[in-house]
Amino acid sequence: MSIDIDWERATSGPDGELLAERIRSFIHDKFQQMVLPRFIRSVQVTSFNFGTIPPELEIRDLTDPFPDFYEDGDEDLSVSSEEQSPMREQADRYRERIDSWQTNSPGGLEVQMSGRMGFGHPLQLAPDEDGSRLHPLRSPINLGDINPYLFPRSGTPGIPGGTSNLGYFMPLSGLSGSQTPLRAVTRGNPFSGGWPDSPLENESRMGHGQGPPRRRSEVNVDAIQSRPSTVNTGNTLFSRGSVSTGDPRHSHSSQTVLANNPGQAPEANDSPVSAVPPLSGTPPRRMREQKAEDFQVFCRTKYAGNISLSLTAEILLDYPMPSFVGLPLKLNITGLTFDAVAVLAYIRRRIHFCFLSPEDAYALIGPETGGGGGDTMEPNSLRRKNLSLLRKIRVESEIGRKENGKQALKNVGKVEKFVLEQVRRIFEEEFVYPSFWTFLV
């Protein structure tokens, strides 16, 4: 199904001029960021115009949007509250409470834990509306309590624990049961305690054989088996300045101190591993909820118009010495031709727009739109030819100032080739999937 576009109405008027200025500014910024050849200096994009010839559009398919379009980025934090999920709102409340507590509490974190709270009481915050609580920070691992048979190292005078390549925050709760010192487990010795001066370490040493039963800070190594724990490096409320969007009530780790009752012992079947979510090297992506009214359109786009782009630069001559003289350059792109598949997705007041590469278009739409000009092409031929979405770009260049109505130089191929390569690169990096543009409507 073909679509007719009122090109003049869409590209003229105040809105059209504003859009053209934004595109000009965007291309200008991209040229400022790229590395220029030695003989070109100070590239400036002076004007951009949509032209008078509209593109030809043909709808090919209607599907569900790509999953990447549902990703909730940092730029979406200003969206109205009705679009935010309850989990995200709860995470934002936790972040605000943490920032408020750090701002209003005098002294550092150690003063809060040891001076005001005392050694016998874990750090507690007021429960939220749903009854969930924030977890206290844990002390670093005492490397001196490591079994020497597991990590052999030579002792060094003056350095407690010897010289080991073991990381400072490397967790020890994931050691297998076959390598665990059983006497330490049966006697209730905390295998992964904190530093000697930490409140949790002092409390665990004072409580042997005289007081409360074992708390969650004392890890059951046999229950974990050989799976290493990553709680020290991953799922913390202060990591990377952001809060995980998972439900805080289900984010308890094996080293979490009981905040409800410090003297209450965990149940026998309380497995710390079952509550630890799988962690990866990158934080999980926040995704919006999919709705039935979301849709995506695949549209074949053909364009052979008179779009124009003007650039100015300076060419340096190295004779008789480097950068001896600079000649002004004016370069005009007077039109281009391309044939591609455009993707237009509508998701709750947002429009996501991008183009597909020839290989992706062949896989999703078919061989009819895989190559330019409607030719049927196989994927191997597409990779071999390395086709670009921009088929032809018409360029006119003028070098030097006019003297007696004549130009000093015209249509210098080396300069034109560089500019065309950069225009193609900017277009493919910014407009071809997985890159896409989002517009609020």
UniProtKB/Swiss-Prot annotation:
Self-association and partners: Component of the ER-mitochondria encounter structure (ERMES) or MDM complex, composed of MMM1, MDM10, MDM12 and MDM34. A MMM1 homodimer associates with one molecule of MDM12 on each side in a pairwise head-to-tail manner, and the SMP-LTD domains of MMM1 and MDM12 generate a continuous hydrophobic tunnel for phospholipid trafficking.
Mode of membrane association: Peripheral membrane protein
Keyword Cell wall biogenesis/degradation applies: no
Chain segments carrying region Disordered: 70-89, 180-289
Principal subcellular localization: mitochondrion
Listed name of the protein: Mitochondrial distribution and morphology protein 12
InterPro entries for this protein: Mdm12, SMP_LBD
Its biological purpose: Component of the ERMES/MDM complex, which serves as a molecular tether to connect the endoplasmic reticulum (ER) and mitochondria. Components of this complex are involved in the control of mitochondrial shape and protein biogenesis, and function in nonvesicular lipid trafficking between the ER and mitochondria. MDM12 is required for the interaction of the ER-resident membrane protein MMM1 and the outer mitochondrial membrane-resident beta-barrel protein MDM10.
Signal peptide residue numbers: none
Source taxon at top rank: Eukaryota
Subcellular location: Mitochondrion outer membrane; Endoplasmic reticulum membrane
Bias-annotated ranges (Polar residues): 226-245, 253-263
GO term, biological process aspect, one: mitochondrial genome maintenance
Domain SMP-LTD as annotated: residue spans: 1-441
Keywords per UniProt: Endoplasmic reticulum, Lipid transport, Lipid-binding, Membrane, Mitochondrion, Mitochondrion outer membrane, Transport
Keyword Transport: yes
Domain notes: The SMP-LTD domain is a barrel-like domain that can bind various types of glycerophospholipids in its interior and mediate their transfer between two adjacent bilayers.
GO molecular function: lipid binding
GO CC list: endoplasmic reticulum membrane; ERMES complex
Family designation: Belongs to the MDM12 family.
